[in-house]
C-alpha cells in the first residue's frame, strides 16, 4: 500500500513526463536526475527541469501474455519503449490499439490513465500510457 503524500510528490514525473536536462551537455533524462551522469562533476547544479515531449514513435515493444495476478484482467497487453520526438526513451503500456497492428515506428502520444488501485476503496494511481497518434 502506498501513501497519498508520496503519490502527490511524484505527480510531476508521473503525470506530465517531467524530466531534466543538463545545461552543460544538453542531455535529457527521464525520469528526472539530480545530476548529469555524463558530465559528472562538471554537471553538478547544471541540471534543470525539462518537459519531455509527449509524442513519439514505438522504438520496441512486447506483448505480455502471462502476467502477475493483479494484471489478469488486462491480459494480453502491450508494453513499449517509445522514443519521444526529443529523443528520450520512455517505457510504458500501449493501450487503445489492436495488438496485431502494433509496429515499430508507429506514431504514439502519451495520455493520462488509471494504472491501478490499492484495493476496492483505496488510492487510485494514475500515470502515463501511450496510444496511437493517428
Where are these regions (language model features)?
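Short nucleic-acid-contacting surface segments enriched for D/E, G, S/T with interspersed K/R
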Residues: 96-109
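OB-fold/S1-family single-stranded nucleic acid-binding modules
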Residues: 113-134
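Short functional micro-motifs and their immediate structural scaffolds
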Residues: 30, 44-48
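Short, conserved beta-turn/loop elements at beta-strand boundaries and strand-helix junctions
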Residues: 62-67, 115
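Conserved hydrophobic positions within beta-strands
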Residues: 56-58, 94
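Short, cysteine/histidine-rich loop/knuckle motifs that typically chelate Zn2+
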Residues: 21-24, 37-41
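Short aromatic-glycine-enriched beta-strand elements
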Residues: 67-81, 125-127
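Residues immediately within or flanking Cys/His clusters that coordinate Zn2+
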Residues: 16-19, 33
Amino acid at each position: 500500500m502506498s501513501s497519498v503524500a508520496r503519490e502527490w510528490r511524484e505527480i510531476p514525473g508521473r503525470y506530465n513526463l517531467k524530466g531534466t536536462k543538463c545545461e552543460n551537455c544538453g542531455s535529457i533524462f527521464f525520469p528526472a536526475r539530480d545530476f548529469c551522469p555524463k558530465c559528472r562533476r562538471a554537471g553538478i547544479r547544471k541540471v534543470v527541469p525539462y518537459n519531455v515531449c509527449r509524442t513519439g514513435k514505438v522504438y520496441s515493444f512486447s506483448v505480455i501474455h502471462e502476467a502477475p495476478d493483479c494484471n489478469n484482467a488486462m491480459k494480453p497487453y502491450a508494453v513499449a519503449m517509445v522514443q519521444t520526438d526529443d529523443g528520450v526513451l520512455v517505457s510504458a503500456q500501449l493501450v487503445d490499439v489492436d495488438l496485431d497492428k502494433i509496429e515499430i515506428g508507429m506514431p504514439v502520444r502519451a495520455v493520462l490513465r488509471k494504472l491501478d488501485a490499492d484495493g476496492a476503496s483505496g488510492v487510485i494511481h494514475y500515470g502515463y500510457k501511450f496510444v496511437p497518434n493517428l
